[in-house]
Amino acid sequence: MKCDDGKAYCAAPVNIHRIDWFWANKKVLDSNGIKMPTSWSEFNAAADKLQAKGIIPLAHGSQPWQDATVFEAVALGIGGNKFYKKAFVDADTKTLGSSTMVKIFDQMRKLKGYTDPGSPGRDWNVATGMVMEGKAAFQLMGDWAKGEFAAAGLKPDVDYYCAATPSDNGYLYNVDSFIFFKIKGQDKVEGQKLLASLMMGKNFQKVFNMYKGSIPARL
């Protein structure tokens, strides 16, 4: 658990998510002779081919957080680890205004052209459903999308493909946590401890993360 020296809160992590994944409908890709892309140029070529046949290349919900998810994956893939850290951790102005950043926005513009008119405001799981149903070929989404495929009874390499988005071995991740604030009342404190212990229990971690598509915070 992460605490701020016991002053106001403690945070109990429940999982670790990798964000930069491509999900794809196996039947759509196989029937069009397309493999999971290992570079952005390969993805663009595949998307152009699919679009020419009237297939939506990229299922996406153009909500701010989903746009940010795609942008970060593209930035890491094109710029690399050092570029990403300088741009988004250090906020280095030279990096933010570089030719590499222009390439990143060029790729984002391409991706926008591969989505359908219904993209704005679409929930992420609806976009995942488009891939599952063969209405679209790809989705760029975190590993929580696996939970949708699993709930539908679909299996990897049988019904769908998944692979990391193109990068130089970098990756993006986040941690889901429950925050416990400092409160008065021993009964409330004991309740917090019980909830934290249950969430960090091995059985809960195994079952929860299997369905969530994430990595257990505790192995």
Locate predicted features:
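Short, solvent-exposed loop/beta-turn-alpha elements that line the ligand-binding surface or hinge
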Residues: 1, 35, 78-103, 151-155, ...
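Periplasmic solute-binding protein
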Residues: 2-36, 44, 63-89, 172-181
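A local structural motif
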Residues: 31-36, 109-123, 135, 153-159
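Extracytoplasmic/periplasmic substrate-recognition and gating elements
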Residues: 31-32, 113, 151-215
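Short helix-initiation/N-cap motifs at beta->coil->alpha
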Residues: 40-45, 118-133
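Glycine-centered hinge/linker elements that transmit conformational signals in sensory
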Residues: 47-50, 89-120
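Alpha-to-beta junction loops
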Residues: 54-57, 133-142
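Beta->alpha turn/N-cap motifs
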Residues: 124, 141-146
